[in-house]
UniProtKB/Swiss-Prot annotation:
NCBIfam families, per the entry: prfA, PRK00591.1
Keywords per UniProt: Cytoplasm, Methylation, Protein biosynthesis
One Pfam family it belongs to: PCRF
Subcellular location: Cytoplasm
Function: Peptide chain release factor 1 directs the termination of translation in response to the peptide chain termination codons UAG and UAA.
Post-translational modification (record): Methylated by PrmC. Methylation increases the termination efficiency of RF1.
Cleaved signal peptide residues: none
UniProt GO cellular component terms: cytoplasm
InterPro entries: PCRF (IPR005139), Pep_chain_release_fac_I (IPR000352), Pep_chain_release_fac_I_sf (IPR045853), Prokaryotic/Mito_RF (IPR050057), RF-1 (IPR004373)
Entry-annotated residues carrying N5-methylglutamine: Q232
GO molecular function per UniProt: translation release factor activity, codon specific
Name of this protein: Peptide chain release factor 1
Length: 364
């Protein structure tokens, strides 16, 4: 049974938000306008689906009334089953849409990819993963901005960080967090032996300055000449920035830009996102183990996926899904994989009757 009173309240809130966003006071405050627009965007699918269901219910009532009319009964009888199926579909959609939302889901996202076990092959795999996510971002019309890039001497990346901006970025990429494993024959392998390597992906919701306050006295900032693979200079200026957050010991480096100020701004962006994630994880630790084991929590030590090149196979270990289309997935065709993870998470939430708080998945 759908909570009609709750749906009507959401409808009223949507109308209120549209009114507020037109007020001069809000238009003069960009941060407040952004906050209200984020809320409006989040509840709009509920309002649209509820309006469609109300329209379907109205048509069902009209058709039932028309059954007693000899001129209209045949048409009404033909239309009713289709309308009733549509009502059931919309009711199921609304049930999912009303699940608790993670406030991070509409945020932009910082991704950090680091090579793990496997030496040179791990660095190449880290580069493959970054390229895969960039290609996926292209299909979603998201923007990718490199924040930091450390190349390995034999190719690939020791680590790479990027900010991905667009609609509902975090709600899709949250599932990429964890340890990714690759099984393939390296180009340098003369006997055809399969090597196993890993790379770790961290997925962080972008933090605004209002989300995380950082005191300048808690920062230790050092400047150096930027460096590339094999000690080669990326540029000749002292523009590379390293920031250490003294209370937590976190260290962030950025050397992607020629401007020291731009590198510092990018490093601060990553630091804020890491601190926001740290605080949210502390809060989650106080919650049930059941919630923490849900798909999409992005635990960094969790083995999430294996990419087997000889078999053209990708296996997601969290939901036991195997797809024999690695060649397409590594080129950014992640829609089927991420869609299955989102569906699985929604099913978990429905089965458990919904859970509140920041690890939950929005419906689209």
């Amino acid at each position: 049974m759908l909570p009609i009173a709750k749906l009507e309240a959401v409808q009223r809130r949507f109308q209120e938000l549209e009114h507020l966003m037109c007020s001069p006071a809000v238009l003069a405050a960009p941060a407040e306008l952004q906050r209200l627009n984020r809320e409006r965007t989040e509840i709009e699918p509920v309002v649209v689906a509820f309006a469609r269901m109300r329209d379907v219910e109205r048509r069902i009532a009209e058709d039932r009334e028309a059954l007693s009319d000899p001129d209209l009964s045949e048409l009404a009888q033909a239309e009713l089953p289709e309308l009733e199926l549509e009502r059931e579909r919309l009711a199921a959609e609304l049930e999912v849409l009303l699940l608790p939302k993670d406030p991070n889901d509409t945020r932009n996202t910082v991704i950090e990819i680091r090579s793990g076990e496997g030496g040179e092959e791990a660095a190449l795999f880290a580069a493959d993963l970054f390229r895969m996510l960039c290609r996926y971002a292209e299909t979603k019309r998201w923007k990718v901005e490199v924040l930091n890039l450390s190349e390995a001497s034999a190719g690939g990346y020791k680590e790479v960080a990027a900010l991905i901006t667009g609609q509902d970025v975090y709600s899709h990429l949250r599932y990429e967090g964890g340890v990714h494993r690759v099984q393939r024959v390296p180009s340098t392998e003369t006997q055809g032996r399969i090597h196993t390597s890993t790379a770790t992906v961290a997925v962080l919701p972008e933090a605004d300055e209002v989300d995380v306050h950082i005191d300048e006295k808690d920062l230790e900032i050092s400047i150096a000449a930027s460096g590339g693979p094999g000690g080669q200079g990326v540029n000749t200026t002292n523009s590379a920035v390293q920031i250490k957050h003294l209370p937590t010991g976190m260290i962030v480096k950025c050397q992607d830009e020629r401007s020291q100020l731009k590198n510092k701004a990018k490093a601060m962006k990553v630091l804020r996102s890491r601190l926001l994630e740290l605080e949210q994880r502390r809060q989650e630790e106080a919650q049930s183990a059941e919630r923490r084991t849900m798909v999409g929590t992005g635990e960094r030590a969790q083995k999430v996926r294996t990419y087997n090149f000889p078999q053209n196979r990708v296996t997601d270990h969290r939901i036991g899904l195997t797809l024999h289309k690695l060649d397409k997935i590594i080129e950014g065709d992640l829609e089927e994989l991420i869609g299955a993870l989102r569906t699985h998470r929604q099913a978990e939430l429905l089965r458990r009757g919904g859970l509140s708080g920041p690890a939950l998945e929005p419906a689209t």
